[in-house]
Amino acid sequence: MIIYEESASDYYNKNDRLLYGIIEIAESTIVTGSNIISDLENQGSQLQSIHYNLEHIDSDIQIANDKMDHVESCLPSVRKTARKSFKKISKKLFKKKLVSKNSRLDSGVQNSEIQNNSKIQNNSEIQDNFANNFLDNPPDNSRHFSEDNIEKLHNIVCVLEKQANDISNILDEQNNTLEIIHNKIISDEIAIKKITRRIKHTQS
């Protein structure tokens, strides 16, 4: 019976091929991480655009409030003049029997509401624990790996750690922006409803 004894060279090559396979997986993970960061940055641009548009809406609401202040300040004199004119016209029309005393004008104002159904989803994640654990707890036979591959894997892990940190920071920033947008939408809805009530009150 012939017993095959694995040479140091064969043992070295087998372990080095294993390490090279891990490196390939880690490199593909870096590409995935770059794509995630790119998508998040595009998402951030869209959120900033929404935020910018809401700032314009706030400005429009303020203008509407200022105009309503002016209208309401003029209402007493307008109503007084309107009553006098209406009495004169009513008398003339009554005499000519063109209208009845009970004629009435109804008007309605429809309220427009702001809705934001945009939802941002991101279920992608970077899994780099396998490489990190490998470097923190190397096997006893790690001396059989080539120094170049070990250094390459170490650099890849550093890149993955930076990507994970960048993604975490981007998500935190976008969560803050989303909260600001959410609060603005609620306050704008309340402001629009108040303006609508003021308009209805001036027309009553």
From Swiss-Prot:
Residues 9-71, 140-202 form the t-SNARE coiled-coil homology domain. Keywords: Coiled coil, Repeat. PANTHER family: SYNAPTOSOMAL ASSOCIATED PROTEIN, SYNAPTOSOMAL-ASSOCIATED PROTEIN 29. The lineage of its organism: Viruses, Varidnaviria, Bamfordvirae, Nucleocytoviricota, Megaviricetes. Signal peptide: none annotated. One of its GO terms (cellular component) is plasma membrane. Residues 159-181 form a coiled coil. This is Putative t-SNARE coiled-coil homology domain-containing protein L657. InterPro entries: T_SNARE_dom.
